Amino acid sequence: YNLTGEDFLLELGHLLHRQSFSFIDMVDRGDLRRPCTIHCVNLAQGIKEPIIYYQQDTDRKYIDAVKEGFRDIRRFHGQPQGMYGGDEALHGNNPTQGSELCSAVELMYSLEKMVEITGDIDFADHLERIAFNALPAQISDDFMTKQYFQQPNQVMVTRHRRNFDQDHEGTDLAFGTLTGYPCCFSNMHQGWPKFTQHLWYATPDNGIAAIVYSPSEVTANVGDNVPVVISEDTYYPMDHQITFTIKEVRNKVKQVKFPFHL
């Protein structure tokens, strides 16, 4: 709707919200305080729904429910890399519990949309924690192998049965193409491109905001439609120094005489 302005999309959005699984009710019931109440990736994907719908119904309860949900997740299932114990089903905060790679990239995308809609820095901090800790550790540099589950206290990356909710013949921690379950090999590639797409955000006063930090360059029209190129240079999060270089793009007027002579 934000792109087309077609009213039927708002009607469809309301219908989907009304008929779909209610994440607000899930939080109110205390489901996120207990194990095995929801699949780990369904949670990562669906937790953004109340804030997506908040664009249509600006009731603060939608944002508050998501924040309360994250508090419950951190307290009862949270892991230091920003994820939660969810080795298929939600599974507590024991450091030997696994966290699925699909959950990482899907939760990153959910947080990216939450930042885009609310501008809330808590969501941005959570996004960075996953991007710079969980995601790099589960994918090989050439993107040819992946780790289905990751443990915070990961001593051995071996084929071995562990105390996961689902144990795929002991292959969950082993790096490979089809180890664990193949869904993550199809899904892992979205993590970095979508993260890059959500480094910079437009502001209501025709400005631009760097809310999530990473080396990047953006071209945009700001203020009174002035074209600029902003380069960001940083080793963040290893170094908290960030350098922004801002260049105004000036269109040079060239005079051309006809006919052309080569």
Where are these regions (language model features)?
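Glycan-recognition and catalytic cores of secretory/periplasmic carbohydrate-active enzymes
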Residues: 1-261
